[in-house]
Amino acid sequence: MAAAAAELVIGWCIFGLLLLAILAFCWVYVRKYQSQRESEVVSTVTAIFSLAVALITSALLPVDIFLVSYMKNQNGTFKDWADANVTVQIENTVLYGYYTLYSVILFCVFFWIPFVYFYYEEKDEDDASKCTQIKTALKYTLGFVVICALLLLVGAFVPLHLPNNNNSTEWEKVKLLFEDLGTGQGLAALSFSISSLTLIGMLAAITYTAYGMSALPLNLIKGTRSTAYERLENTEDIEEVEQHIQTIRSKSKDGRPLPARDRRALKQCEERLRTLRKRERHLEFIENSWWTKFCGALRPLKIIWGIFFILVALLFVISLFLSNLDKALHSAGIDSGFIIFGTNLSNPLNMLLPLLQTVFPLDYILITIIIMYFIFTSMAGIRNIGIWFFWIRLYKIRRGRTRPQALLFLCMILLLIVLHTSYMIYSLAPQYVMYGSQNYLIESNITSDAHKGNSTLAVPKRCDADAPKDQCTVTRTYIFLHKFWFFSAAYYFGNWAFLVVFLIGLIVSCCKGKKSVIEGVDEDSDLSDDEPSAYSA
């Protein structure tokens, strides 16, 4: 029992250290992007807290896999301390952790974030009192609460029975597996709600992460345009516009009023001239900035990072393609959510993670790197694309200039994407997420020359769906991911869409030219002349 407690403490201590690192990362990340002029304490705390909860939930995945793996020896036998009661206790500890964190996520998504968002939307109205702002925000938030309640009710009572197919032995495996996942109504309701959010996260990942995986490394490799060259172009544009303004004004030297067409052209030229002079001030500031010189010295390092990121992206894409192809060829079909038994087509990550798990916490570190990679590539995609509602651009994400409402939208999108990363990791390494490094014993017949006959020997085999129910423990993560087969089917098709969008994004990123060092300065209507430092960072 003491050994069991020691193993449990090791896993949770690593989780605790990672929790502190997550909180520090979220604080730095949110503070980096929030507007310095419109900073609000409540929106900042909400953004940090919601993003941290999502990352902490993802951090439970390697803990879950670690605990089920450490119940067994590599020879396929259970450890001495891993009796039935201890095993159930460990599983319940992780399950209650998921219950708590997923409940907090539902609270953030369906109540707290919408309330804070609508509160600041009403705050923009100068004549609205604080009481009116709260009432209006609660009124709009009530709609989200109703949606959450409906999802919980549907999840609690939706039928989980799979279609019958008596002619296939695979169906028997699927039925037994789903029976093993439990039938609690509370678990079903929570799983349905979280799966619905994960489905939205899948759409966000297809839109932002897939594009960011190609845009981020190629932008690092290509770099930005030369500041001196941009200043030269800008100076030529200023001279051209000034000359055009003088030409228009010369038409009224004799006192005659300008025609309406010329007045409109003059107004447009004056606006253009103000914008160009504003660009000139920012370009001059950036050219003389020590930060620009420092970044120039780091240019070779950025190229190396870009090459590394594109190689990692190709590794993920190849692994995801092989995993999806394996499901297409060998799964139990769409009505089972494309559940696959065993691995017929191995991919690099599916082979690497079980090997790293033998030296704890190497697999923990790799999963953390994968999650952070998805965060950074998603952020790159959001910064390049912006936040849109169909064809209407709602917000731009700018370093040091993101409004409180946009910051909440940003963290909401990242929260949903992080939720989806658990399924992405499962797609990349299904056997690892389901059973970790567990083995079980099977009887194998061998021929012995000494005894001139056959003998039976128990040999270890990697856990899969063919293993006896009492020999392999399924992770609690897998329960939440596959409680409803139709969500798994949607994720499967979403993975193909992810691959297509990545390829499209790769082509677009290759065709696009270098970015300006002050990209977005022309679009930012709130850009003041005394704050050029935001674009020098």
UniProtKB/Swiss-Prot annotation:
Subcellular location(s) of the protein: Endoplasmic reticulum membrane; Lysosome membrane; Cell membrane; Cytoplasmic vesicle, Clathrin-coated vesicle
Phosphoserine modified-residue sites: S525, S528
Extracellular side: 1-7, 69-97, 163-185, 324-361, 427-483
Keyword Lipid metabolism recorded: no
Result when mutating Y229A: Significantly reduced interaction with adapter protein complex 2 and disruption of its function in clathrin-mediated endocytosis of INSR
Post-translational modification: N-glycosylated.
Inactivation phenotype: Early embryonic lethality. Embryos show an impaired initiation of gastrulation.
A biological process term (GO) from this entry: clathrin-dependent endocytosis
Pfam families: LMBR1
Superkingdom classification of source: Eukaryota
Principal subcellular localisation of the protein: endoplasmic reticulum
Cellular component terms per the entry's GO annotation: clathrin-coated endocytic vesicle; clathrin-coated vesicle; endoplasmic reticulum membrane; lysosomal membrane; lysosome; plasma membrane
Alphabetized GO MF terms: AP-2 adaptor complex binding; clathrin heavy chain binding; cobalamin binding; insulin receptor binding; protein transporter activity
Residues carrying sugar: N75, N85, N166, N167, N344, N445, N454
Positions in the Cytoplasmic compartment: 29-47, 119-141, 207-302, 383-405, 505-537
Stored InterPro entries: LMBD1_LysCbl_Transport (IPR050854), LMBR1-like_membr_prot (IPR006876)
Keyword Transport: yes
Residues spanned by motif WTKF motif: 291-294
Job description of the protein: Lysosomal membrane chaperone required to export cobalamin (vitamin B12) from the lysosome to the cytosol, allowing its conversion to cofactors. Targets ABCD4 transporter from the endoplasmic reticulum to the lysosome. Then forms a complex with lysosomal ABCD4 and cytoplasmic MMACHC to transport cobalamin across the lysosomal membrane. Acts as an adapter protein which plays an important role in mediating and regulating the internalization of the insulin receptor (INSR). Involved in clathrin-mediated endocytosis of INSR via its interaction with adapter protein complex 2.
Subunit structure: Interacts with ABCD4; this interaction induces the translocation of ABCD4 from the endoplasmic reticulum to the lysosome. Interacts with ABCD4 and MMACHC; this interaction ensures the transport of cobalamin from the lysosome to the cytoplasm. Interacts with INSR, adapter protein complex 2 and clathrin heavy chain.
Protein name, entry field: Lysosomal cobalamin transport escort protein LMBD1
Organism for this UniProt entry: Mus musculus
